[in-house]
Amino acid sequence: MSHPTSTPAFTVADIRKSFLDFFASKGHTVVPSSSLVPGNDPTLMFTNSGMVQFKDVFLGTDKRSYVRAASVQACLRAGGKHNDLENVGYTARHHTFFEMLGNWSFGDYFKRESLKWAWELLTDVYKLPADKLWATVYIDDDEAYDIWTKEIGLPPERVVRIGDNKGAKYASDNFWMMADTGPCGPCSEIFYDHGPEIAGGPPGSPEQDGDRYIEIWNNVFMQFDMQPDGSVKPLPAPCVDTGMGLERLAAILQHVHSNYEIDVFDALIKAAARETGEKDLNNKSLRVIADHIRATAFLVSDGVNPSNEGRGYVQRRIIRRAIRHGYKLGKKTPFFHKLVADLARLMGDAYPKLRTDEARITAVLKAEEERFFETLEIGMTILDTALAGGAKVLPGDVAFKLHDTYGFPLDLSADVCRERGVDVDETGFNAAMDRQKNQARAAGKFKMDRALEYAGSGNTFTGYERLEETAKIVALYADGVPVAALTKGQSGVVVLDTTPFYAESGGQVGDEGELISGSAHFAVGDTLKIKSDVYGHHGTVEQGTLNVGDHVNARVNLAVRAATVRNHSATHLMHKALREVLGEHVQQKGSLVNAERTRFDFAHNAPVTDDQIREIEARVNAEILSNVATDASVMDMEAAQKTGAMMLFGEKYGDKVRVLSIGSSKELCGGTHVTRTGDIGLFKIVAESGVAAGVRRVEAVTGENALAYLQSLESTVQAAAGSLKASPTELQQRIGQVLDQVKSLEKEIAALKGKLASSQGDELMAQAFDVKGLKVLAARLEGADARTLRETMDKLKDKLKTGVFVLAAVDGNKVQIAAGVTADSVTVVKAGELVNFVAQQVGGKGGGKADMAMAGGTDASRLDDALKSVRAWVTERA
């Protein structure tokens, strides 16, 4: 990665200004960037695109004073479905914080103006070579295609029609939908060709995922209303929504390939190097720090401080990730907050709040740094103690304590343990911790594999036929670097000339097992592809030394492989059943198959009902009971297509493919599978959920795991039945009876509380005192809830006719407070002000109307003093 020494022709600041100036000249209102915290969508964690602040306009629930708008929107993607945090800093274009250039038409102009202005801006203002630009359109969008080819003059060979490449009607990279129903329409994307020296093919080609052709601008034309049945109707007033990544455009205009080489990042990377003392400006940790200072500073400016929940937890994760990378560079004292001044200098003109909030941002980040550096030191002490004496495994309870009590990142614990040749026992982690572990592990493996450089021959895979093989070590790696040997305690990657280990692919995880060579023992924790035909065996040397050239006995873990193949074969049967029960529109969107379960994502626009789940389970288990043999045949693609085998949209296949037949299912698949369907044993769906618009997820278990799941449910039912003194078959009826009894008792309790309140109300009247002719009462009402307080208050107001009342009750340490003022006294005393005065003294707050208000508190020990203070408060106002 190069680092510019001169000012580029178009700085990031220039690009922002010229974009807004251009669209202002076209009659657009320049709209300021909205907060990173969406104000109109509680379901969205962060503003992740320019259109978020206009969502209500598109939905028809809001109307602006303008019909054309342009903005440069600050965006953040970290957390939720847009969680790419582990990739940030390791790829050329992944960021947490980024800026989105956009222009919008709310029922005004449409495709012709949008595309022509986009072309004019790119070629006339930014001076991009016309022969470097490509465009895509939705396959049926003849209007957009004609505008590109006949009016703008883009050669037809550089305008690509994109069909429904996501498995269902209108499920396309070039068809945008806000949700399952509602506004939608085709889009036209503009791509920039970085040149033949970069790998990758044009959009729509099998090689489109390469880095040569980069999407820079998307023009969305909202012209339809998606109906519940999947049909579309024209919108009365079509709209335009466009978005162009500022960082991507800057990389092109500044003639660099990575976003981290543009002027803003170049300056921030140098600032991070200054504060950490790192000399290598290409160090990925510096890129992480440079990215994260933007995200965290803008979040603080928008009111998001680090915490342990919601947006605050995402903020804390980002901050601590940056600090961890500084720690890796040897920085043991707070440094991150010192970059705020650099950021304010670089981006303060575009975002003035960075300057006005600079001191507050710096203070918040510094406090979090100081807290976490203290946590790091404590965590390291705990780790050192736990690993003393040659321990080979960090106990799961210790790892959980580090994470839960000290906020110690799980990946940091694992990093320290790997350096010492120690594994982490993750059994004690709950499901949320397991999910977090898998995400970090998957991201870490990807980065490591991509870093390995292997120029030798491919290995022979024998894992379809056998699970044990004699093989020769042809390469060894430690920390991504080729080595001649791996010694005891060292983690690394082993490449063999022949292997029975399956490498992670097609959703199936890689095999586990062991490599034995004399007294040397290498525990394989995972198997991943270095290249398509080169498998890397990831693990740790537990005994002896492995050398390049050694012969080893490679043994796959039989139990783990058996459980994994059961789940994989069941996934094929489930896919077939899903299409039969839900419809042929069902297409695979993603999968994860391991020894514990199978997770399958598929295209479908509605939740799968309980009855449908039962039908799917019945069909899969019927295939299992038939116990038919499976068959795998390698053939030409043309022959495979003739067999009717299912092929996944977007999947890359070679000239030779493997057709797998399992029961009535036939798919292309390179994974490992059972010999007969009966080997699966039992199939049970355990979860169904939505993961994105038009995408559902099913999770299922098989074999012993399915039996264990059902036995667990049985134990729960039996325990519940025992508690209710009923048999399992009587449980539902008994629960209904108990619920009826509870409702009856609740009514009785409410009636008794009302009687109690009435009797106490008479007694309380005697406690009222006079303040300048105004009756005032401030007292406890024992055993009352909020409803009883209100009812008693109403009765007191009826009886006394004129006065001010405060009633309070305590439940545990929680305080409920009611304040009431008769109609003739509200000009003197407001109930809302009075209840807040009392509530603040017991650690709470509240509100309401002038004549009645409620509040809560958390410090019951101060209630009596708070009630006594009412006399003085009313006296001041009477």
Curated annotation (Swiss-Prot):
GO MF terms, alphabetically ordered: alanine-tRNA ligase activity; aminoacyl-tRNA deacylase activity; ATP binding; tRNA binding; zinc ion binding
Cofactor(s) the protein requires to work: Zn(2+)
CDD domains for the chain: AlaRS_core
Binding-site list for Zn(2+): 568, 572, 669, 673
Signal peptide: none
Superkingdom of origin organism: Bacteria
Intracellular or extracellular location(s): Cytoplasm
Job of this protein: Catalyzes the attachment of alanine to tRNA(Ala) in a two-step reaction: alanine is first activated by ATP to form Ala-AMP and then transferred to the acceptor end of tRNA(Ala). Also edits incorrectly charged Ser-tRNA(Ala) and Gly-tRNA(Ala) via its editing domain.
Name of the featured protein: Alanine--tRNA ligase
Species annotation: Polaromonas sp. (strain JS666 / ATCC BAA-500)
Encoding gene (name): alaS
